Amino acid sequence: MRSRLLLPVPHLPTIREMSEELSHGAAGQEPPASPSLDDYVRCICQLAQPTSVLDKVTAQSRPNRPSRPAWTREKRRQAESPGDSSLCVSSLQPTLPSPGTDNPLDWLFGKSQGEQADGRGRPNRTGSSDPWDVPRQMGKDTGRLCEARVPEHSLGRKPGPRHQTSDLKSWTSRKSCRALASVSSSRPSSILGTLYLHLPVIHEL
């Protein structure tokens, strides 16, 4: 079944058949000549030619703009003062080391260290005069925030199980801190007694 379907399909011509048809089929017409070596080299030279050369050729073919008269250029140069140009040149040129210095690296590092020292010596007067005012103010603000926090059970609400566990953890941490402070201040003989007194009591559920 499959072979019967493929039989009426015309096959594509091969390369040999195409060349034979071109050579023998066209009567009285010569086949096109193959490109010679000179044509090949000429095409390569055209492809390898840079675009800048083409741009120059197109620019030369365009009509040139009318040039400004020389007296306008002279007026413009006279308008610019020589002092301004000297200032611009002096600002652009960096300061060179003195001829007495042996190593230019020593001069360069000495200059950078001097600039850093000048920057440190100048106080930052944009804010307050005391640099410790900002941390103190932040500490006061955090203290106020801590004082503003009120436990929920003091407002008449029943503490939930999560709040109870958090309160228990905070209470144990406070007790341990107090115990450590008392241990550091007490005598070695009373260390065990203070530890037993301040240890938290765990109730069985």
Swiss-Prot record:
Tell me the GO BP annotations in alphabetical order: autophagy; regulation of autophagy
Compartment(s): Cytoplasm; Peroxisome; Mitochondrion
Q: What is its main location?
A: cytoplasm
Keyword annotations from UniProtKB, A to Z: Autophagy, Cytoplasm, Mitochondrion, Peroxisome
Name the Pfam families for this protein: DEPP (PF15343)
Point to the regions of Basic and acidic residues compositional bias. 138-155
Q: What induces it?
A: Up-regulated by hypoxia.
Region (Disordered) location: 55-171
Query: Which residues, by range, are in coiled-coil regions?
Result: none
Q: Name one GO cellular component term.
A: mitochondrion
According to the UniProt entry, which residue ranges have a biased composition of type Polar residues? 55-64, 83-101
Taxonomic superkingdom: Eukaryota
Q: Per its database record, what is this protein's job?
A: Acts as a critical modulator of FOXO3-induced autophagy via increased cellular ROS.
Q: Which PANTHER family match?
A: PROTEIN DEPP1
What's the protein name? Protein DEPP1
Organism whose genome encodes this protein: Mus musculus (Mouse)
What lineage does UniProt assign to this protein's organism?
Eukaryota, Metazoa, Chordata, Craniata, Vertebrata
Q: Which gene encodes it?
A: Depp1
